[in-house]
Amino acid sequence: MPRYTIKEREMIRRIAVIYAVGVAGFIIPFTHRYFMLLTPLVLLLSLALLIWYDRDRRKGGQLNRILFYLFVFTAGFLVEMWGVKTGALFGSYLYGSGLGPKIYGTPPLIGLNWVLMIYLTSAIFTPRRRNLLNGIVWPSLLMVGYDLIMEQVAPKMDMWSWQNDIVPLQNYLMWGVLAVIFHTLRYRMKVRDRNVMALPLFVVQTLFFLLILLSK
């Protein structure tokens, strides 16, 4: 477990409060539609927070990391676009308005969401010994576990919805395959993400979706 400074602990408390307000906002019928509009902003703020606390953001030699995450963003977005169009990858689904403007039915922010998930799960295991388990297996499994919860809540937040309101098994399989591909590439490129806020933010986001799910 990382050790946190007083300022870092204060930031973690603020993050928890913001997401707690978000849970209440989505649960209360009167405020639900207003909080749906804030989803893109929260995603962008989460990325900004991670960039700010990234241990290596001011160091040189970051070209590999920049290229890797540009690839994750582009590939993630294009795969989702193809998935929406064909239904062959994840199953039959459509994006709502929860993630903002769309290009050919797919919001560009979903590419940033892939970046966020790869970065978070990478940074959580980076402090541990570098091997295939910590570099690829555990981060990928963590992503699939996160998706298992998020998929149950996404329609309620108007992020996306599934045909017949059923999340197909192939969605989780595809999430796992993409997670392994991205993390394998990251591992081979020796991209290391060190961020003290990665674990707290991941836990808070997971609890956010879980609490909304349990409120149904």
Language-model regions, residue ranges each:
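Aromatic-rich, lipid-facing transmembrane alpha helices and their immediate juxtamembrane interface loops
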Residues: 1-216
